[in-house]
């Protein structure tokens, strides 16, 4: 009886220690570290893509990257499905928010940005980010 309790307790410890290592993702989502990812084969503009992601799962948004390993994981999921293409990332209007002053140090008190806002895409083949018109249609990767 004592041996059974010891073995049962040992299995419980192993289960509990492993339960926190991966995300608890829906069956059609892929997990990497503590996050869940889903590649969608629909093309949409950035705003619709972000809204779409928020409707897929609580806490879901367009993909964000925080390491080269995370990019490699997403590439491993997107490339077989989407081939060489682009997916939206959760970055937009970066140029409007970036520059707060001119290179000579004077305050940016006048702006003449074009009406076109820029959003950021990631290539499905490697870790390259590109600025594109937010109204263009690209594939979607959601993350939560």
UniProtKB/Swiss-Prot annotation:
Its main location: secreted. Residues 32-143 form the C-type lectin domain. Keywords: Disulfide bond, Hemostasis impairing toxin, Platelet aggregation activating toxin, Secreted, Signal, Toxin. It comes from the Eukaryota. GO terms for molecular function: toxin activity. Expressed by the venom gland. InterPro entries: C-type_lectin-like (IPR001304), C-type_lectin-like/link_sf (IPR016186), C-type_lectin/snaclec_domain (IPR050111), C-type_lectin_CS (IPR018378), CTDL_fold (IPR016187). It is found in: Secreted. GO terms for cellular component: extracellular region. Disulfide bonds join 25-36, 53-142, 119-134. Residues 1-23 form the signal peptide. Heterodimer of subunits alpha and beta; disulfide-linked. Negative results: does not show affinity to coagulation factors IX and X in the presence of calcium ion. Also shows no inhibition on thrombin. Belongs to the snaclec family. Snaclec that induces platelet aggregation in either human platelet rich plasma (PRP) or washed platelet suspensions. It causes aggregation in a dose-dependent manner even in the absence of various platelet agonists such as ADP or von Willebrand factor (vWF). Interestingly, it does not induce aggregation in rabbit PRP. A monoclonal antibody against the platelet GPIb receptor blocks the aggregation induced by trimecetin, suggesting that it acts by binding to GPIb (GP1BA/GP1BB). This is Snaclec trimecetin subunit beta. The lineage of its organism: Eukaryota, Metazoa, Chordata, Craniata, Vertebrata.
